[in-house]
Amino acid sequence: MASLRDIKNRINSTKKTRQITKAMQMVSAAKLNRAQEKAQSYEVYAKKMREVVGNIAQAGSDTSHPMLEERPVKKTGYILMTSDTGLAGGYNSSLLRDMMKTINERHASEDEYAIIVLGRIGRDLLRTRKQPIIQEMVEVPDQPTFNDVSGLAKSSVEMFADGVFDELYIWYNHFVSPMTQRVTEQKLLPLASVNEGDETSSTSLYEFEPSEQQILEAVLPRYAESLIYGALLDAKASEFGARMTAMSAATDNASALIDELTLSYNRARQAAITQEITEIVGGAAALE
């Protein structure tokens, strides 16, 4: 049985751990609020961008662009968005597991795909598994600006345009709620989806100058880059939600453990006092 000192030391160390997890929970909650606000604000821009691009793409049969056209797939690119730090529950593990499962099902060899990875957790695991990483980015800011990821986004789009790969997917955790993040695969290139859905309005509302084709040449790469940035904002909100939930659970578990240890301490202390009283009474009886 543990001594009173051992139990007391465990109580004190668990209380210190609880202070840390509680602080991390509060910090993550504050970061989550800012990340949600940023993602929601950016969605307004992204929605309008989709509408404009869709209208240009549908404006006439003469408009075309390599980024809108399907081509035979010889190689596939994947952008993986993970976190730089852990303590976020299954945020990274579930994402990596699902992506690698999909890759193994789609491709017979590593020559058929390449990975662009954001986040130290994902990069380190992919290196351990000797996966074909062609570009990486670590130390992503908690509140990233477009300039923070513009280099990676631009090079990803350029690699598709140059034929390094023939299609490009983004893998990230979509924010549903602080307790729920959904692993998401989004096809980025080619941009066939801009011709579909309800995002576009009547082209009669727009007049294009100098021409639809010239505007497409300028706008499409920027639009694709904006999709990468939008996914990153979503992933950041998911990361902070997952970490806040994980730290909340850790704080609750620490509190439960402290209660259990306190009960054990009181019982052990009571037993020690009872033993001392018994010994005193026994000694007094022996002297009579």
Curated annotation (Swiss-Prot):
InterPro entries for this protein: ATP_synth_F1_ATPase_gsu, ATP_synth_F1_gsu, ATP_synth_F1_gsu_CS
Main location: membrane
GO CC terms of this entry: plasma membrane; proton-transporting ATP synthase complex
Membrane topology: Peripheral membrane protein
Keyword vocabulary terms for this entry: ATP synthesis, Cell membrane, CF(1), Hydrogen ion transport, Ion transport, Membrane, Transport
One MF term in the entry's GO annotations: proton-transporting ATP synthase activity, rotational mechanism
Pfam families, sorted: ATP-synt (PF00231)
Gene Ontology process terms (BP): proton motive force-driven plasma membrane ATP synthesis
Compartments, record wording: Cell membrane
Subunit-level organization: F-type ATPases have 2 components, CF(1) - the catalytic core - and CF(0) - the membrane proton channel. CF(1) has five subunits: alpha(3), beta(3), gamma(1), delta(1), epsilon(1). CF(0) has three main subunits: a, b and c.
Family: Belongs to the ATPase gamma chain family.
Role of this protein: Produces ATP from ADP in the presence of a proton gradient across the membrane. The gamma chain is believed to be important in regulating ATPase activity and the flow of protons through the CF(0) complex.
Protein name: ATP synthase gamma chain
